């Protein structure tokens, strides 16, 4: 169960998509954190500056949530460890996952995704989200390719509608809200 962890780390628990890590500090204390495969989020923008969002029922919110489309860079912890061991660039792996998720969730074939930022979850959770801006896309003739059990509706919102959805609490993935409000909407509103 080593997974090439540094000598100061010990895996205390390993699940299907994450693990509890005990990291020994220089003073001997143990710092515990949770690590899981990183994820991707897509900021898909149309020529008329609308942003694609998905509407889906989310277990964690207990209702419908507006979200940026996306998913995991790798589906399991084992696949994530294999990716790390391969030496492949994580940003490149994230861009490939972004293309896969775009097709599955939105039915769009994307090209030239541009990394906006990598947002971390905080000190006690290692779960980065790679945000990609996508301005070049076309519809797949097959439409969405949803996984079993997924029910995802696609909508296009203006920057003003995105702000309203955030204010009303309809978008609850707060890292995505931060990226939208801090990086994306100012750019779109400036170019309008």
Task: Please give the residue ranges for each predicted region.
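Acidic, metal-coordinating catalytic segment for phosphate/diphosphate chemistry
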Residues: 6-48, 56
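Active-site-adjacent beta-strand/loop module that shapes the phosphate/pyrophosphate-binding cleft
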Residues: 23-29, 122-141, 155
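Acidic pyrophosphate-coordinating catalytic loop
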Residues: 12-16, 59, 118-129
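Short Lys/Arg-enriched alpha/beta "domain-start" segment
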Residues: 1-2
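Conserved Nudix-box catalytic region and its N-terminal flanking loop in Nudix hydrolases
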Residues: 34-36, 41-100, 148
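Conserved hydrophobic "DFG−1" position in protein kinase catalytic cores
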Residues: 44, 53, 133-134, 156
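Nudix hydrolase/Nudix homology domain
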Residues: 6, 64, 70-71, 123-124, ...
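A short coil-to-beta-strand element that immediately follows conserved catalytic motifs
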Residues: 109-116
């Amino acid at each position: 169960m080593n997974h090439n962890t540094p000598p100061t780390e010990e895996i205390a628990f390993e699940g299907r998509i994450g693990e509890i890590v005990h990291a020994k500090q220089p003073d001997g204390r143990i710092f515990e954190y949770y690590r899981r495969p990183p994820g991707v989020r897509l900021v898909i923008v149309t020529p008329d500056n609308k942003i694609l969002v998905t509407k889906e029922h989310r277990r964690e919110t207990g209702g419908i949530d507006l979200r940026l489309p996306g998913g995991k860079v790798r589906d399991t912890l084992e696949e994530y460890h294999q990716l790390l061991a391969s030496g492949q660039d994580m940003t490149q792996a994230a861009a490939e996952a972004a293309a896969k998720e775009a097709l599955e969730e939105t039915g769009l074939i994307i090209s030239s995704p541009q990394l906006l930022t990598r947002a971390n979850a905080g000190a006690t959770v290692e779960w980065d989200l790679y945000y990609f801006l996508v301005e070049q896309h076309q519809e797949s003739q097959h439409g969405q390719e949803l996984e079993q059990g997924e029910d995802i509706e696609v909508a296009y919102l203006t920057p003003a509608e995105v702000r309203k959805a955030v204010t009303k609490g309809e978008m609850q993935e707060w890292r995505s809200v931060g990226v939208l409000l801090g990086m994306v909407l100012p750019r779109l509103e400036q170019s309008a």
